[in-house]
Amino acid sequence: MSTFDNTTQLAPLKTWLKESFALTRFELQPLVNDASSRQYFRLQMDSGSHVVMLAPPDKENMAAFIAIAKDFARQGIYTPEILAYNIEKGFMLLSDLGNDLYLNLLNANTVDDLYTRALSVIHQIQVCNPKLPNDQPLDLFNEQHIRFELGLFID
């Protein structure tokens, strides 16, 4: 799915991490990708961990991603903190939210609370109106967009 070639992109990413953050010892562990051309890695260091996102600049609008993340944070929506980025190269360093999944926490005692909280956040996202760079509009999630997204499963 991704347009990134790991051997081509990981070397510049490692250089960016070393030069930007004075890292000498670290490991990049691949994380499960989402349904986009982005790739995620856990950056494991002696001092802890962060998440690194690779976003092909020709496929992903990183400026919009940053604007939406900032707006979500202002609205109190819990998202990873953006620690650093290089838009031209498609690199982003994010805080690490860990591995906890709702699926692992769901049981008869937690189901009502977890789903109530999830629906509350979905509502917050729906009413959020982020300001994108250059006043560009958010993509509409209409039938055409849904068909495009579903077509990704065929790839």
Regions found by a protein language model. Give the residues of each.
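Juxta-kinase regulatory segment immediately upstream of eukaryotic protein kinase catalytic domains
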Residues: S2-F26
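Charged, low-complexity surface segments at secondary-structure and domain boundaries
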Residues: M1-T3, L138-D139
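ATP-binding glycine-rich phosphate-binding loop
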Residues: L23-F41
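Alpha-helical interaction segments
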Residues: D5-N6, Q29-V32, N142-Q144
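ATP-binding pocket architecture of kinase catalytic cores
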Residues: F41-F148, L152
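Conserved P-loop NTPase mechanochemical-coupling segment
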Residues: D155
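Alpha-helix N-cap/loop-to-helix initiation residues
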Residues: N6, S36, D58-N61
